[in-house]
């Protein structure tokens, strides 16, 4: 039973090529169209969303943030949001439900922040290990706690996104598997529940991409 449930997350292969991962890059096919087509209402709405995110990330980074650094986090948000939504369509591989992708996004970002901070702002990074007002007797323990909490950050970022994507898809799969054994009346309620769950999954897709980008921005602001 569990094998069948999780089989929707298995990347299949054709001619020894894992073609499912190509769904991650489908968004690249849509980017060139904005340069030669007249902007539609959807483009205007999307541009306003990106502008709002730019202002928010710039506020989170503070005055010490480098110019243009917000585009990294906006691109990260766009990539995760696109793949989260693509995973909601039938027969499209959900790449963000795999730690292979989420950890590949979180770990290099965290490593870059840490290397930049410890090389250029060493004293500032040491000061982060001991919160202000900590009693002297607790300082060694706080250093250990802060170090561990810092090390697990990329893991928590990746697992949070992966777990949220898997949970919703598993619920949809469970409900879908019960359909053939139900009466027509119960199938109506089942479809209503699945539509409601799909709407909730759309909200989760947006929220999780936003959370991933915001937390990455906050981690970046700590090393400046």
Swiss-Prot record:
It comes from the Eukaryota. One of its GO terms (cellular component) is proton-transporting ATP synthase complex. InterPro entries: ATP_synth_F0_asu, ATP_synth_F0_asu_AS, ATP_synth_F0_asu_bact/mt, F0_ATP_A_sf. It is a multi-pass membrane protein. Keywords: ATP synthesis, CF(0), Hydrogen ion transport, Ion transport, Membrane, Mitochondrion, Mitochondrion inner membrane, Transmembrane, Transmembrane helix, Transport. It is found in: Mitochondrion inner membrane. The keyword Hydrolase does not apply. Mitochondrial membrane ATP synthase (F(1)F(0) ATP synthase or Complex V) produces ATP from ADP in the presence of a proton gradient across the membrane which is generated by electron transport complexes of the respiratory chain. F-type ATPases consist of two structural domains, F(1) - containing the extramembraneous catalytic core and F(0) - containing the membrane proton channel, linked together by a central stalk and a peripheral stalk. During catalysis, ATP synthesis in the catalytic domain of F(1) is coupled via a rotary mechanism of the central stalk subunits to proton translocation. F-type ATPases have 2 components, CF(1) - the catalytic core - and CF(0) - the membrane proton channel. CF(1) has five subunits: alpha(3), beta(3), gamma(1), delta(1), epsilon(1). CF(0) has three main subunits: a, b and c. This is ATP synthase subunit a. It comes from Drosophila simulans (Fruit fly).
């Amino acid at each position: 039973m569990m094998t069948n449930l999780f089989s929707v997350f298995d990347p299949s292969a054709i001619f020894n090529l894992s073609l499912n991962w190509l769904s991650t890059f489908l968004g690249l096919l849509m980017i060139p169209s904005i340069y030669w087509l007249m902007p539609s209402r959807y483009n205007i709405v999307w541009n306003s969303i990106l502008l709002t995110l730019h202002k928010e990330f710039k506020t989170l980074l503070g005055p010490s943030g480098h110019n243009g650094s917000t585009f990294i986090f906006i691109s990260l948000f766009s990539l995760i949001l696109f793949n989260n939504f693509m995973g909601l369509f039938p027969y499209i591989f959900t790449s963000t439900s795999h730690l292979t992708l989420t950890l590949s996004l979180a770990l290099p970002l965290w490593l870059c922040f840490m290397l930049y901070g410890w090389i250029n702002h060493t004293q500032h990074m040491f000061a982060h290990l001991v919160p202000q007002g900590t009693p002297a007797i607790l300082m060694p323990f706080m250093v250990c706690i802060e170090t561990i909490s810092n090390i697990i950050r990329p893991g928590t970022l990746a697992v949070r996104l992966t777990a949220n994507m898997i949970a919703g898809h598993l619920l949809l799969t469970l409900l879908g598997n019960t359909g053939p054994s139900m009466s027509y009346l119960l199938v109506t309620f089942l479809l209503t529940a699945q539509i409601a769950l799909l709407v909730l999954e759309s909200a989760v897709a947006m929220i999780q991409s936003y959370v991933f980008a915001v937390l990455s921005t906050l981690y970046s602001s700590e090393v400046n």
